[in-house]
From Swiss-Prot:
Keyword Acyltransferase (UniProt): no
Name by which UniProt lists this protein: O-antigen export system permease protein RfbA
GO function term, MF aspect, one: ABC-type transporter activity
Coiled-coil segments on the chain, per record: none
């Protein structure tokens, strides 16, 4: 690796850290509870879904609270990143106009910021494991980084597409909101994948978000790395990132005039 490439990678990393840190400070400025909100939101939804599906509808899934949060927490990372990415270039319009830097770092910093929030939820998962008489597995040490990197690649691919196209098609945010809500129910977060009738199994087979959620759930609940799901996550992520960067590189020269 050349000295120039090392410098470039170091510069990109420093830039990513600076922008992520800025976004965190802006988000939690004057906030009393700070990072706790990143845990409270999915936990509240988990409590609501537990009441509806376990107590009212009596869904027969063992350790249902743990089952829920191991799906909801990584989903929250993805959904928040995808939704916030729509406005990532718009929110940083002044920086983009006045400073020369790789603009693709902006949606990536958003993904990383939400990833930090996800890491804050892992102690909650550990606490519920102990509640249900279970223990974290040693495989978490390498499993969490492997799946997390895959989710970063996948989510960045989605985010760079959304953040770029939303500058030119502002109706996109409406479609994204509906799409994320639809995909939430098409992904086995509230229910087990084996509860889906055979004729609808394609919903799981062709849904990379299902592979993402099931990868985390297998790791957290069973200590297992499901390489089939992880491979789907990585392959889809690389494809989305390549497509996203192609769209970004084609349209980035018009950012200043749009913003």
């Amino acid at each position: 690796m050349s000295l120039k490439m090392k410098y470039n990678l170091g510069y990109l990393f420093d830039l990513l850290v600076v922008i992520t840190n800025k976004d965190l400070k802006v988000r939690y400025k004057s906030s009393v509870f700070g990072y706790l909100w990143s845990i409270a939101n999915p936990l509240l939804f988990a409590m609501i879904y537990y009441f509806i599906f376990k107590l009212v509808m009596r869904v027969q899934i063992p350790n249902y609270t743990l089952f829920l949060i191991t799906g909801l927490f990584p989903w929250q990372w993805f959904a928040s990143s995808a939704t916030n990415s729509l406005f990532s270039f718009i929110a940083n319009a002044q920086i983009i106009k006045k400073t020369v830097f790789p603009r693709s770092v902006i949606p990536l910093s958003n993904v990383m910021m939400e990833g930090l929030h996800f890491l804050c939820t892992i102690p909650v998962i550990i606490a519920f494991l102990f509640v249900y008489g279970m223990r974290p597995s040693l495989s978490w040490l390498w499993g969490i980084p492997i799946i997390a990197i895959g989710q970063v690649i996948f989510t960045f691919g989605i985010s760079i597409i959304f953040s770029t196209l939303n500058l030119f098609f502002r109706d996109l945010e409406r479609f994204v909101s509906l799409g994320i809500m639809l995909m939430f129910y098409c992904t086995p977060i509230l229910y087990a994948s084996d509860m889906i009738p055979e004729k609808f199994s394609w919903i799981i087979t062709y849904n990379p978000l299902a592979s993402m959620i099931l990868s985390w759930r297998e790791l957290f609940m069973n200590g297992v790395l499901n390489y089939e799901y992880i491979s789907i996550l990585y392959i889809t992520g690389f494809i989305l990132t390549i497509v996203g960067l192609a769209i970004f590189n084609k349209l980035k020269y018009r950012f200043a005039e749009i913003l």
